Regions:
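DNA-binding alpha-helical recognition surfaces that contact promoter or target DNA
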Residues: 27, 55, 85, 92, ...
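N-terminal DNA-binding module of tyrosine recombinases/phage integrases
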Residues: 1-54
Length: 170
């Protein structure tokens, strides 16, 4: 019988390192280190049932948010969006546990998640983009913003660009 913390270490090294990008890898490890291992890391994988999962979600709702080196906690307690991410990660991990024949069924299937409110994002029009670029004084930031708007690139994609990826004539 394997502890959840040990199982997640194996899961991340055998699955996560191959399937996730750098940003996803960091955020998943933060969830594991801040919200999973401290609460249920010492439990055995085989001991997790849907009832245990429901109790875990209740515990998370009363758990203080953790600030990390890249993200400051914006709520007092773990938000419903973060709980959704944690359960999604654990559902994926326990799906692998079923595949690896560690457990017979996934206790994270059919989980009832707390209601999450999603904020509608504002979409910038051409005038708003032009205003932002005009007000940008930093030349490197200007290039990054321009690439982001023109090519729909995310920050990680922009930071990962190298000259051999740039084809100006095309």
């Amino acid at each position: 019988n394997q502890k959840i913390s040990d199982f997640l270490y194996d899961f991340v090294s055998l699955y996560g390192e191959k399937k996730w990008g750098v940003s996803m890898y960091d955020s998943q490890n933060s969830l594991i280190n801040n919200y999973i291992n401290p609460i249920i890391g010492d439990m055995e994988v085989q001991a997790v049932t849907p009832r245990v999962v429901d109790g875990y979600i209740q515990t998370l709702q009363k758990t203080a948010s953790v600030s990390t080196k890249t993200r400051k906690a914006t709520t007092t307690y773990v938000s419903n969006q973060t709980i959704e991410k944690i359960i999604k990660l654990l559902r994926c991990a326990f799906k692998q546990a079923v595949r690896w024949e560690i457990i017979g069924r996934n206790p994270f299937d059919n989980v009832v998640l707390p209601k999450t409110e999603y904020k509608k994002r504002d979409i910038w029009d051409a005038e708003m983009i032009r205003t932002a670029l005009d007000k940008c004084a930093d030349s490197k930031l200007y290039v990054a913003m321009n690439l982001s708007f023109a090519c729909s690139l995310r920050m990680g994609e922009i930071l990962g660009l190298t000259w051999d990826n740039v084809h100006i004539s095309e």
